[in-house]
């Protein structure tokens, strides 16, 4: 099975599907507690258009290794140190650097489309802004940077409680169960997601959340994301949200990469994983937008299907 390591302490599981000669490659990045299979509703669609598709389980998730984090790490250690086997962190910037190294290993040097969900968007936008020579389009799904500092500071109890690690998974399960699913979401989806979250190692989950939004400098906070990404997202950008609030940061605070091509789409009523439950509508937006930005050939009006 394919694994890749930038930091020797992490073996990252990935799949490389589609033609190696494809003109464009899609990198799929998941959110907190998720795995590559969360994109199973999109992969067949992407492959049907002869795109190369790279799916990866990031640090601590899915089939990738999840070594015990160093509790002394309270800020991102940086590019070089995050590759050191003695440095075990779970910041999204480290995840992004892992993915960039993997793409280089696979010989992917241009025409990359990044699609990321929720916490994965911190890594996705990092990749898009760090490597504008590589990324030609960015697609964000319910970006985590919708949350402002005011909300993050209100929730510091999640990290400051003396029993924080013991409480973090039950707290997240309660939060996700309450706020991330609508009455229209089927029971099987909610059951699957929350049972999967319950399987996590508590120390790894704590480290993922700390790196994602607990650290006052983390990219999962609106103000930090705007500071890090505003004006640096040069590629066309499609932002899809489960409600208007989730797309607000991109709409109101992050300048467009391309005035003519950037879009915001809201698909309401199907929760945080709407790309699973409304996959035909979601994939339809991807197809239309890919045609708009030139990734797929445009279909002339009235052309036979």
Q: PLM features: what roles do these ranges have?
A:
Residues 114-116, 141:
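Short beta-strand immediately N-terminal to the catalytic nucleophile in serine-hydrolase-like folds
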Residues 116-120, 124:
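Gly/Ala-rich beta-loop-alpha elbow adjacent to hydrolase catalytic centers
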Residues 8-81:
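Conserved HGGG/HGGXW glycine-rich cap/lid loop of the alpha/beta-hydrolase fold
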């Amino acid at each position: 099975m394919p694994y890749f390591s930038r930091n020797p302490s992490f073996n990252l599981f990935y799949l490389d599907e589609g033609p190696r000669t494809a003109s464009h490659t899609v990198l799929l990045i998941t959110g907190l507690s998720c795995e590559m299979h969360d994109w199973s509703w999109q992969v067949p669609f992407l492959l049907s258009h002869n795109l190369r598709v790279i799916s990866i389980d990031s640090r601590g998730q899915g089939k990738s290794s999840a070594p015990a984090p160093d509790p002394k790490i309270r800020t991102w250690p940086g590019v070089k140190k995050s590759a050191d086997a003695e440095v075990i962190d779970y910041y999204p910037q480290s995840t992004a650097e892992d993915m960039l190294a993997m793409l280089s290993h696979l010989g992917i040097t241009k025409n990359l489309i990044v699609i990321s969900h929720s916490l994965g968007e911190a890594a996705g936008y990092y990749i898009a802004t760090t490597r504008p020579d590589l990324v030609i389009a960015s697609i964000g799904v319910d970006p985590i940077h919708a949350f402002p500092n005011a909300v993050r500071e209100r929730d510091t109890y999640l990290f400051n409680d003396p029993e924080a690690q013991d409480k973090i998974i039950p707290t997240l399960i309660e939060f996700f169960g309450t706020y991330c699913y609508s009455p229209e979401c089927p029971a099987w989806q909610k059951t699957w997601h929350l049972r999967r979250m319950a399987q996590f190692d508590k120390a790894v989950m704590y480290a993922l959340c700390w790196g994602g939004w607990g650290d006052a400098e983390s990219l999962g906070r609106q103000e930090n994301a705007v500071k890090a990404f505003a004006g640096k997202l040069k590629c066309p950008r499609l932002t899809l949200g489960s409600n208007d609030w989730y797309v607000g940061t991109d709409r109101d605070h992050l300048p467009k990469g391309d005035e003519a091509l950037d879009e915001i789409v809201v698909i309401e009523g199907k929760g945080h994983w709407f790309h699973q439950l409304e996959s035909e509508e979601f994939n339809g937006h991807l197809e239309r937008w890919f045609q708009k930005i030139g990734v797929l050939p445009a279909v002339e009006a009235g052309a036979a299907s």
